[in-house]
Amino acid sequence: MVKDREFYRTMFKIALPSALQSFISFLVVVVDDMMVSSLKNGVAAQAAVSQVNSLTAFYTATVLGLVSGSSVLIAQYWGRRDLGRIKRIFSIVLWICLGVSLLFVGVMRLFPRAVTGIVIDKNEAEVTALALKYLSVVCFSYIPFAISNALVGMLRSIEVVRITLYIAVLSLFTNIGFNYVFIFGRLGFPALGVPGAGLATLLARIVELVLVWLYTFRAQKRLDIRPRDLLKTEAWLARDYAKYGLPVGLGDMQWALVGMLKAAIIGQMGAAFMAANSITNSMMNLGTMFTFALAGGACVVVGKAVGAKDYARARQYSNTIQVMFFIIGLIMAGVVLLLRRPFISLYGSAEDPTVRSLCLSMIAIGAVTLIGTSYHASCFVGINRGAGDSRFVALVDLLCGWLVVLPATFLAAFVFKAPLPIVFLCTRIDQCFKWLIAFIRLRGDKWIKNVTRDQEAAG
C-alpha cells in the first residue's frame, strides 16, 4: 500500500467534491422521480420519464465519454505543466461535444415518435404520450449540458474541483424549485405535470452553464484561458485525441447504446417493470457514485505519474487503488442492502405491490454486483484510462456489451420468458466477470502508455 500522503490527498481532493456532485445529481433525479411518481398516473408518468431518460443517458454518456477521453491527455500534460496544449485539447473537445449535442437535439425534434418507440412498447399508449411531451422539452437541455461538462471536465483534470461542487449544490436547489413550480403549478404558473419536469431540467442546465462559464473564464486562476482560446486548435493534438481520447468516448457511447437497448427490452415488458427498473437504477447509482468519483481521482494521479515517466510509482499506485476499491465495493453493497426498503418507500409508484416486489428483488441482485463494479471501475475508469490504455477499455466494453449482456438479456426476456428479476440480472451480468479481466490486464506492463509528446516530437 502507498504510504505517501500526497497520493491520498490528491485523489480524495478530486474525488470528494466529485462524489458530492454525483450525490447532488442523484438527489435531483430522485426528487424528480418522486414528484413525477406522485402524480395521479404515477406509474405511467414515472415509466415515461425513466424511458426517455434512458435515451438521455445515451447522450449523456456520449458527451461525458468524449470529455473523459480528453482527461487521458490533459492529466498527463498537467503532470508536465504544459498549459498551452491543455487549452488546445480543451478547445477540440468542446467543439466536438457541441456538435454532438446539436446532432442529438435535431434527431429528437425531427423524429420524436420513432425515438421513443425504441424504448417503449407501442401498446403502451399512455406512457408513449407522456414520453413525447417530456422529450419535446428536455432535449434542449442537451446543449448547455455539453458545454458545461466540457468545462467541468477540463477543470477537474487540472485539479480544480471545489467550484463544481458549489455549482452542483445550486443546481440541485434550482432543479427542485423549478420541478415544484412547473410540475404542480405553483407561484401562479400552470401545473404542467410531466412536461414541467422537462422544463425544470432545461432551466437548471442553463443556470449551471452560466455559472461554470463565468467561473472558468473570469474567476479561476489555475489555467489562464479566455473565450478566444476556444478558436485555437492544433491538428496533431486533434490526431492524438482521436488516437487516445476518442476510444474512451466511443467506448462510453457504445456502452450507453447497450444501456439504451437494454431499456428497449425492458420497455416491452410493462409499465410496472419500467418503473421498478427506474427505482432500482437510482439505488444502483447511489451505490456507485463514490466509486466512479474516486476512479476519476485515480485517473488523474496515475496519469500524472505516467506523464512524468515515473512508471514505478504508477504501478505502486495501481496496486493500492485496486485494494481500496475492492473494500469500497463490499461496503457499498452492504449500504445498498441496508437502505433498500426505506429508499423504495420514497416513491409513490412503489405503493403498487408488483412494483415494490420487483424493486426488492432487483436491488438485492444489483447490490451483489456492486462488488465487481467497484473493482473494475478502479481499473478501467481510473488506472487504465489515466495510464493511456483507453483502447483496451473500449474493447472490453464493446465485447462484453454486444456479445454477452444484450444476447443474455434478449434470450432471458423473449426466448426463455424468465422471471423479471432474472432478466434484470442479465442486464448486469458483465459486472460479475469484468473484474477478472481488469485484474489480469494489470498484472503486466501493457497498460502503461505515455501519450504525451516532447516539443520536438510535436512538430
Regions found by a protein language model. Name each.
Residues 67, 138-156, 164-172, 197-212, ...:
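Short runs within selected transmembrane alpha-helices of multi-pass transporters and secretion channels
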Residues 1-18, 74-141, 189-246, 302-369, ...:
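Short alpha-helical transmembrane segments in multi-pass integral membrane proteins
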Residues 46-106, 145-164, 276-340, 374-393:
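Small-residue-rich hydrophobic transmembrane alpha-helices
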Residues 13-32, 137, 148, 171, ...:
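Transmembrane helical elements of multi-pass membrane transporters/channels
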